[in-house]
Design a protein with these regions (language model features):
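Generic structural hydrophobic/aromatic packing signal, biased to beta-strands
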Residues: 19, 47, 76, 150, ...
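Generic preference for hydrophobic/aromatic residues in regular secondary structure cores
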Residues: 3-4, 10-20, 25-28, 117-123, ...
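Juxtacatalytic substrate-recognition/specificity segment
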Residues: 1-68, 75, 79, 83-98
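Beta/coil-rich, acidic/histidine-enriched accessory regions frequently appended to metallopeptidases
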Residues: 171-299
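Acidic/His/Gly-enriched intrinsically disordered linker/tail segments
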Residues: 64-146, 173-198
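Structured segments of extracytoplasmic/periplasmic soluble domains
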Residues: 52-56, 79-86, 152-160, 164, ...
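Hydrophobic transmembrane alpha-helix bundles
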Residues: 2-24, 97-104, 164, 195-222
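Stable alpha-helical elements in mature extracytoplasmic
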Residues: 37, 41, 45-49, 71-75, ...
Length: 299
């Protein structure tokens, strides 16, 4: 981004996108065939172009601060998905696929493949990785978390919300709230439920409120396919815990994480009381923003 600031010392007053080039004989770096370079650069170009656009809109055009890392990276991964969506529309099933079981055409692979892997790894460790608080520039699990959140958000509010998130001087959670017209706590709570409720086994998909599922992508279906492609054993790795009445569930939860628990019981048996506390058995401080979302499962 410094190249975009003409007043910066040492600036060449140009916008440059740096990428790898084919080097099959490893003359200047590790070996990169032409096919490898093309495959890797496609999604990376869309990803980095979003960063350039975001910096221009936030800093240069509006004089604000650069977008928060978690949201900036999440939007760049959404930009990668645009490449997949282009080829998905160009090659509807079963066209453009090496095998009839493929969910996506071959040409979409370089764009959607890494996103699905990131998402799977996040779901496999959702208690350890935050949606909104990155460790540095973000692990692949954290990036998977933010992509899933923004994908769900766009399904709820329309794809144009990504434009509103970029064309503004707002950043972070305040940006999400302004663009969506909702409190972040409400969005995060329903997103947490959607991760579990989307395409719930044994329940018709349209029996789940649209707010508690993704749009036309079945999360469990695409994660099950990702498990096959990447050699994982669990078709849907999101952990759920049993919390029968009278039981205690303990867990460490960094900011921006969630835990999913199923409370079995007979509705005719009367109400169930839930109590939450810190590890010291004291109430949560209000600044922590601890919250609970409840979904009654169909019988």
């Amino acid at each position: 981004p410094i190249d975009q600031l003409e007043r910066a010392k040492g600036s060449n007053r140009a916008e440059i996108f740096y990428a790898i080039v084919p080097d099959p004989k490893a003359a200047y770096s590790c070996a990169h065939s032409e096919a490898d370079a093309v495959r890797q650069v496609q999604g990376t170009f869309l990803h980095e172009m979003q960063h350039l656009i975001s910096f221009n809109e936030h800093v240069l055009a509006r004089g604000g601060a650069a977008e928060d890392t978690w949201l900036n990276e999440g939007l760049s991964h959404v930009a990668e998905e645009l490449g997949s969506r282009y080829f998905e529309s160009r090659y509807p099933a079963p066209f453009g696929r090496s095998t009839p079981t493929q969910l996506y055409p071959d040409s979409a692979g370089p764009f959607i493949g890494p996103l699905l892997l990131n998402a799977y790894l996040y779901l496999n460790s959702s208690l350890q990785h935050s949606v909104t608080a990155y460790d540095g520039t973000g692990s692949i699990e954290e990036r998977g978390a933010t992509w899933l959140f923004l994908r769900w958000l766009a399904d709820q509010k329309g794809d144009d919300i990504t434009r509103r998130l970029v064309q503004t001087s707002r950043t972070g959670i305040a940006n999400v709230e302004a663009a969506s017209g909702e409190r972040f706590s409400s969005l995060f709570g329903d997103f947490s439920l959607a991760l579990f409720a989307d395409s719930l086994p044994g329940v018709a998909r349209n029996a789940i409120p649209p707010r508690l599922r993704f749009g036309n992508r079945s999360l469990r279906l695409i994660m099950a396919r990702e498990a096959v492609v990447s050699g994982f054993f669990d078709p849907f790795p999101l952990a759920t815990f049993a919390a029968p009445p009278g039981d205690i569930l303990r867990s460490s939860m960094p900011p921006g994480t969630m835990i999913h628990a199923i409370i079995p019981g007979d509705p005719s048996a009367g109400p169930v009381r839930l109590s939450f506390s810190t590890s010291e058995l004291t109430p949560f401080a209000s600044l922590l923003g601890a919250q609970m979302s409840i979904m009654r499962l169909p019988p």
